Amino acid sequence: MNVRQHKASFFSVVITFLCLTLSLNANATDSVLEAVTNAETELGARIGLAAHDLETGKRWEHKSNERFPLSSTFKTLACANVLQRVDLGKERIDRVVRFSESNLVTYSPVTEKHVGKKGMSLAELCQATLSTSDNSAANFILQAIGGPKALTKFLRSIGDDTTRLDRWEPELNEAVPGDKRDTTTPIAMVTTLEKLLIDETLSIKSRQQLESWLKGNEVGDALFRKGVPSDWIVADRTGAGGYGSRAITAVMWPPNRKPIVAALYITETDASFEERNAVIAKIGEQIAKTVLMENSRN
C-alpha cells in the first residue's frame, strides 16, 4: 500500500468512527425526545421538557421555551427566597408563624394539625410544603417573603426573566390555556434550579437545606423516582392543576457522577392523573437509560 492509499484508508476509518459516534449520540438523545412526543400523542397533551446532564453537558429540550403552569413547582422557589433572605440577614429560619383555622386553604395536611397551637417555624413550613405540598404552608411562606410579586422580583434578581407568580394558593393552579399568570418555561426552570441548587446563589448551608427538603418529598414516588434506578438520589417537587396540568422539577444524582437537572410540564389534556404520572415515570426511565448508556461507553 502506498502512502496515498494509507492516508485514504486512515481517514476513511476516522470518518466512519466519527459518523458512528455521532449516530449513537443522536439516537441516545432522540430516544428521550421520542418518549416525550409519544407521551404527547398518548395523552393528547402539550408537554414541555428541559433536562441538562451536568456530567456530559448533554441537553434534552422539547417545547422548552413554551409557557406552562407552574402549579406547586413554585414552592421550591419560594423556599429558596426565604433561604436567601436568611443568608442576607433579613430573616430567621426559626421565626415562628402563628395562624388560625380561618387562615387555611384547601389541602393543608400538616398545617391543619397546628391550628391553635404554638405555630410553625419558617423551616417547618418549608419542610411541610416541599414534602407534602401543603398549600397553606406555601401561602405562609409567600407572606414571609412579601407575596407573589416579591417572589417574581427575587427570580428577576437571579437572572430568571421568565418565571412569574401572580396569585396565591389555590387560585394559582387554575392553568387556563394561554394565561401567562403563574407560569414558567421548562428551560427557565432548569436554569433557575441550577442556580439555586448547584451554583452559588445561596450559601452552602442554604443549598444543602433546600436539597434536603426536596429529597424528603413524600408525593413524588410515582413520577421520576419510579422511573430511575433505586440507587439514584432524587430531589424533586411536583405539581398539578387545572386542564390536566401535571409537573415535576428535579435534580437527580446517579452514583459517583454529577446530576441531571430536569423540568417536565404537562397541560391541556383529559388524561387521568394516573396516566399522566405513568408517562412522567416513563420519560424519567428513558433519561436514566440514556445516562447509563453514556456511562457504559466511558
Swiss-Prot record:
Keyword terms: Antibiotic resistance, Disulfide bond, Hydrolase, Signal
Taxonomy, superkingdom: Bacteria
Residues forming the catalytic site: 72
Listed SUPFAM superfamilies: beta-lactamase/transpeptidase-like
First and last residue of the signal peptide: 1-28
InterPro entries: Beta-lactam/transpept-like (IPR012338), Beta-lactam_cat (IPR045155), Beta-lactam_class-A (IPR000871), Beta-lactam_class-A_AS (IPR023650)
Protein name, entry field: Beta-lactamase
Organism of this sequence: Proteus mirabilis
Source taxonomy: Bacteria, Pseudomonadati, Pseudomonadota, Gammaproteobacteria, Enterobacterales
Gene name of this polypeptide: blaP
